[in-house]
Design a protein with these regions (language model features):
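Intracellular coupling helices
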Residues: 21-28
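N-terminal single-pass transmembrane signal-anchor helix
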Residues: 1-21
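Short, well-structured segments within or immediately adjacent to enzyme catalytic domains
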Residues: 29-289
Length: 289
């Protein structure tokens, strides 16, 4: 009889405990993202009002030392322990990665895109909102003649996270790691800087996952109905991790805005007059869209 009563009480308490745990993880994630957001203005001050790019790669694609990402550039501002030598070379050991790069609810298994054992595989749950990706000598985005950077007035150019990517066939391409001046963001309080972005190959220092291209990047567009999410081919367990993280956060993602504040929002609250596949609103630096 006593055992039965205890079992009933446990069954009643477990959902409440699970809900409390999820809320605690969501709040911890927000606090971590707030700390990450504080690293950006310090970087800007130290770099002549320039924001960091989301990432750049030198075209060799050999491990280690081929790419630098926003979290590498912010390492010393956000509690990392990587040496200047490692950071300037483009990689750092997993033990030197800031712990705040991993959302506490993001406990999904990761695999190295390099394959095999990877001492540089540290967890990262976040990405900058994309401004586009350059490839080869001329790049696949149109540059603004005023600054040589992606033209943010064009469709598909959302945030300030530039990915300077040189393909292996263009190892000596016209390549740089410039970022935008912070003044290009005309609506800092209404423009997302960092978003949650997890899947099977999301890891610190990985250029391929350093930028997010809108809601469709957050585990495709299936977070609103996680049960409809397709399998993630980049995950070693075949699970769409973005959809699961959205569900773990009670159908919300956390976002850092360009003014440094953090909000937890449903995806449909972020897209303004756009759509899930062509977002506007908080995904762009343009006010009022």
């Amino acid at each position: 009889m006593v055992i039965a009563i205890i079992a009933i009480l446990a069954a009643m308490l477990l959902p409440a405990l699970a809900s409390a745990k999820a809320r605690a993880q969501r709040m911890q994630c927000m606090n971590q993202m707030r700390q990450l957001g504080l690293g950006f203005p310090i970087f800007v001050i130290d770099h002549n009002d320039m924001l960091p790019p989301a990432g750049w790669a030198d075209g060799t694609y050999t491990q280690p030392h081929f790419a630098v990402t926003w979290d590498s550039l912010l390492n010393k501002y956000i509690g990392g322990n990587a040496s200047d030598v490692d950071l300037s070379a483009g990689s750092y050991l997993s033990g030197d990665a800031p712990k705040i790069l991993q959302c506490p609810a993001d406990r999904f298994p990761k695999v190295s895109w390099m394959g095999g054992s990877d001492p540089y595989l540290a967890m990262r749950s976040y990405a900058m909102v994309s401004a586009g990706t350059s490839q080869g000598p001329t790049g696949d985005f149109q540059r603004d003649p005023k600054n040589g950077l992606p033209n943010l007035n064009l469709a598909g150019k959302l945030g300030v996270g530039i990915v300077w990517q040189v393909l292996a066939q263009y190892p000596v391409a016209n390549f740089d790691a410039s970022g935008y001046k912070s003044s290009v963001v005309r609506d800092p309080a209404g423009s997302i800087l960092l978003c949650e972005n997890t899947h099977g190959q999301q890891s610190a220092g990985n250029i391929w996952t350093s930028a997010c291209f809108g809601p469709q990047s957050l585990g495709d567009i299936y977070q609103i109905d996680p049960s409809a999410a397709p399998q993630d081919p980049n995950s070693n367990n075949g699970v769409n991790q973005g959809a699961l993280l959205y569900k773990a956060h009670k159908n919300r993602f956390n976002y850092v805005f360009n003014d440094g504040h953090v909000e937890g929002l449903k995806i449909e609250q972020t897209i303004g007059s756009g759509t899930l596949t062509a977002p506007k609103g908080m995904w762009t630096v343009v006010p009022g869209d």
